[in-house]
From Swiss-Prot:
[4Fe-4S] cluster binds at C59, C60, C124, C154. The gene is nuoB. Belongs to the complex I 20 kDa subunit family. Its cofactor is [4Fe-4S] cluster. It comes from the Bacteria. It comes from Beijerinckia indica subsp. indica (strain ATCC 9039 / DSM 1715 / NCIMB 8712). This is NADH-quinone oxidoreductase subunit B.
């Protein structure tokens, strides 16, 4: 009785991305060079080198930290953390945003270089969450900064945040460099 081993795709790699890289490899093998537009090339490079910074305000920040640990390892998708807003492309707002913290959020967002993206993580960042009716809570960080991706949950899992990162990469690939 023998075992038949079939090759499995790498966990976490979307099949569309595999097909994209396979077509690039085929073109390079056939012709020895690659023909593409500058927009596609810049967007491809941008999706593989997203630098994120945290704006962790509450319990969602724990799941955000878990996403960068070895189990999920967001750096294999080209999503690496940075400590300064001047070195970051993406800001993850995780947790309850209060009225007192809103100007600081806007200041950090303004310090980020263009193009910049925002991921709103969790019910509190998306719409106020459990504290929606409190006098001191902003009912969604999209009232302060433009949000590109919303990740629902209380708190959302690390898988959900990683899926949001992949959606952001797909969005960047679709938009042109000049259009944003």
């Amino acid at each position: 009785m023998g075992l038949i081993a079939t090759p499995q795709p790498v966990v976490g790699t979307p099949p569309a991305q595999d097909n994209y890289f396979l077509s690039i490899n085929d073109q390079l093998a056939d012709k020895g060079f690659l023909v593409t537009s500058t927009d596609e090339l810049i967007n491809w490079a941008r999706t593989g080198s997203l630098m994120w910074m945290t704006f962790g305000l509450a319990c969602c920040a724990v799941e955000m930290m878990q996403m960068s640990m070895p189990r999920y390892d967001c750096e294999r998708f080209g999503f690496a953390p940075r400590g300064s807003p001047r070195q970051s492309d993406v800001m993850i707002v995780a947790g309850t945003l209060t009225n007192k913290m809103a100007p600081a959020l806007r200041k950090v967002y303004d310090q980020m270089p263009e193009p910049r993206y925002v991921i709103s993580m969790g019910s509190c960042a998306n719409g106020g969450g459990y504290y929606h009716y409190s006098y001191s809570v902003v009912r969604g960080c999209d009232r302060i900064v433009p949000v590109d991706i919303y990740v629902p949950g209380c708190p959302p899992s690390a898988e959900a945040l990683l899926y949001g990162v992949l959606l952001l990469q797909k969005k960047i690939r679709r938009t042109g460099t000049i259009e944003r």
